[in-house]
C-alpha cells in the first residue's frame, strides 16, 4: 500500500495563533486560565491545554471575577464582549483575524441599516459569534441560511438594502451555489468581492481534490466537531472515494484498506502534525510504504499575538 500526503494540511495561521495565545497566557500569568469554548475544535489540542492548566467553559458566568479569559478562534458576539468588559475580566481575544474581518463587515452593515445574510451552519460557534455582531438597534436584521432551500424559503424586510457574508470554513462548492441562489433571488444584494471562506479552507479543499483523484481511500485527521475537517471528508466522498474522519490512529480500522493500493492522508486546519504522523505509523505497521507528499500551495501567512503577550514573553 502507498501512502500519499496532501499538501497543505493541518494547522492554519489562525489555529497556530489561538493555541499560542493560550500557551503564552499560561506561561505569563500561570494557571488557571479560562477559555470560552474549545479554543480550536481538536480533542488532542484541548486535552493538552487542559492538562497545562486551561479551564474550558461554555459561558462567562462560569468564570470567576478577576480572572483571565480567552475567547476561542471562532469569535464571540458583542454581548459576550460587553459582559466581559462589564465584569472587568482580563480578556485575550484568540478570534482568528479572518473571522474578525467578517465581524467588521457585519458591524458595518448593521451601522448602515443594511440587512445581512450569513451563510453558515446553525449552532457552530463562529456562526453564533458573527450573528451576535450585528446590532439590530438601527432597524436592520441578520438572517442565517445554510443551503439553497433556505434561500428559497427566506423572506427579508428590505431586499433593496441587503448584503451577505459567509462562515470561513464552508465547502467552497456548496457556498458558490448558495451565493448564486442569493443573487438570483435578490438581484441587488451586496457581498464581498471574494467570499469570506479563508485561504486555509480553500487550500485544503483544493489539496483534497488532488489527493482523492490519485487515491482509493482518503483519511482526514480531525475531530468530529471540526467544520473544515468534515468538509474535507465530504469532498472526497463526492469524488467517489471512501473517506473517513478520524481523531487519531486508534480510530483506524484495518478492514478499510482491504484491497486498497493508495491511501490518501490529510488533516483539518485544527489537527496537529503529531496526529498525522501517528496515523502514518499505524498504516506502516499494517504494511504500508513510506509516505509520499504531493506538491501544493505554499502557506507563509502568520498572525501576531496580542501585544501584552508579546511583551510578557520578551521580558521573560
Curated annotation (Swiss-Prot):
Free-text cofactor note: Binds 1 [4Fe-4S] cluster per subunit.
One GO BP: dimethylallyl diphosphate biosynthetic process
Chain positions recorded as (2E)-4-hydroxy-3-methylbut-2-enyl diphosphate binding sites: 41, 74, 124, 168, 226-228, 270
Cofactor(s) demanded: [4Fe-4S] cluster
Reactions catalysed: isopentenyl diphosphate + 2 oxidized [2Fe-2S]-[ferredoxin] + H2O = (2E)-4-hydroxy-3-methylbut-2-enyl diphosphate + 2 reduced [2Fe-2S]-[ferredoxin] + 2 H(+); dimethylallyl diphosphate + 2 oxidized [2Fe-2S]-[ferredoxin] + H2O = (2E)-4-hydroxy-3-methylbut-2-enyl diphosphate + 2 reduced [2Fe-2S]-[ferredoxin] + 2 H(+)
CDD domains: lytB_ispH (cd13944)
Binding-site residues, isopentenyl diphosphate: 41, 74, 124, 226-228, 270
Active site annotation, chain numbering: 126
Positions annotated to bind dimethylallyl diphosphate: 41, 74, 124, 226-228, 270
InterPro entries xref list: LytB/IspH
Alphabetical UniProt keywords: 4Fe-4S, Iron, Iron-sulfur, Isoprene biosynthesis, Metal-binding, Oxidoreductase
Entry EC no(s): 1.17.7.4
Principal EC category: oxidoreductase
4Fe-4S among keywords: yes
The protein's annotated pathway: Isoprenoid biosynthesis; dimethylallyl diphosphate biosynthesis; dimethylallyl diphosphate from (2E)-4-hydroxy-3-methylbutenyl diphosphate: step 1/1; Isoprenoid biosynthesis; isopentenyl diphosphate biosynthesis via DXP pathway; isopentenyl diphosphate from 1-deoxy-D-xylulose 5-phosphate: step 6/6
Matching Pfam families: LYTB
MF terms (GO), sorted A to Z: 4 iron, 4 sulfur cluster binding; 4-hydroxy-3-methylbut-2-enyl diphosphate reductase activity; metal ion binding
Residues annotated as binding [4Fe-4S] cluster: 12, 96, 198
Record's function text: Catalyzes the conversion of 1-hydroxy-2-methyl-2-(E)-butenyl 4-diphosphate (HMBPP) into a mixture of isopentenyl diphosphate (IPP) and dimethylallyl diphosphate (DMAPP). Acts in the terminal step of the DOXP/MEP pathway for isoprenoid precursor biosynthesis.
UniProt record similarity statement: Belongs to the IspH family.
NCBIfam families (UniProt xref): ispH_lytB, PRK01045.1-2, PRK01045.1-4
Protein name per its UniProtKB record: 4-hydroxy-3-methylbut-2-enyl diphosphate reductase
Species of provenance: Acinetobacter baylyi (strain ATCC 33305 / BD413 / ADP1)
Source organism phylogeny: Bacteria, Pseudomonadati, Pseudomonadota, Gammaproteobacteria, Moraxellales
Amino acid at each position: 500500500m502507498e501512502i500519499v500526503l496532501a499538501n497543505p494540511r493541518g494547522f492554519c495561521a489562525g489555529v497556530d495563533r489561538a493555541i499560542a495565545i493560550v500557551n503564552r497566557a499560561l506561561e505569563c500569568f500561570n494557571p488557571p486560565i479560562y477559555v470560552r469554548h474549545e479554543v480550536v475544535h481538536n480533542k488532542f489540542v484541548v486535552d493538552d491545554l487542559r492538562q497545562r492548566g486551561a479551564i474550558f467553559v461554555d459561558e462567562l458566568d462560569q468564570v470567576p471575577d478577576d480572572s483571565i479569559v480567552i475567547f476561542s478562534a471562532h469569535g464571540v458576539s458583542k454581548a459576550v464582549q460587553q459582559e466581559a468588559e462589564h465584569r472587568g475580566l482580563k480578556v485575550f481575544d484568540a478570534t482568528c483575524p479572518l473571522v474578525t474581518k467578517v465581524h467588521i463587515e457585519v458591524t458595518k452593515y448593521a451601522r448602515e441599516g443594511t440587512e445581512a445574510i450569513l451563510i453558515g451552519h446553525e449552532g457552530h460557534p463562529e456562526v453564533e459569534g458573527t450573528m451576535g455582531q450585528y446590532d439590530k438597534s438601527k432597524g436592520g436584521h441578520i438572517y442565517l441560511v445554510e443551503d439553497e432551500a433556505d434561500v428559497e424559503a427566506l423572506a427579508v424586510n428590505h431586499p433593496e438594502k441587503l448584503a451577505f457574508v459567509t462562515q470561513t470554513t464552508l465547502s467552497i462548492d456548496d457556498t458558490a451555489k448558495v451565493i448564486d441562489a442569493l443573487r438570483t433571488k435578490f438581484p441587488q444584494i451586496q457581498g464581498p468581492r471574494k467570499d469570506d471562506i479563508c485561504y486555509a479552507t480553500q487550500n485544503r479543499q483544493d489539496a483534497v481534490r488532488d489527493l482523492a483523484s490519485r487515491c482509493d481511500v482518503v483519511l482526514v485527521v480531525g475531530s468530529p466537531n471540526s467544520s473544515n475537517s468534515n468538509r474535507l471528508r465530504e469532498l472526497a466522498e463526492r469524488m467517489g472515494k471512501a473517506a473517513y474522519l478520524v481523531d487519531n490512529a486508534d480510530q483506524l480500522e484495518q478492514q478499510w484498506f482491504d484491497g486498497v493500493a493508495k491511501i490518501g492522508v490529510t488533516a483539518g486546519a485544527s489537527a496537529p502534525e503529531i496526529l498525522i504522523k501517528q496515523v502514518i505509523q499505524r498504516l506502516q505497521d499494517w504494511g504500508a510504504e513510506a509516505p509520499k507528499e504531493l506538491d501544493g500551495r505554499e502557506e507563509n501567512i502568520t498572525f501576531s499575538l496580542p501585544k501584552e503577550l508579546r511583551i510578557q514573553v520578551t521580558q521573560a
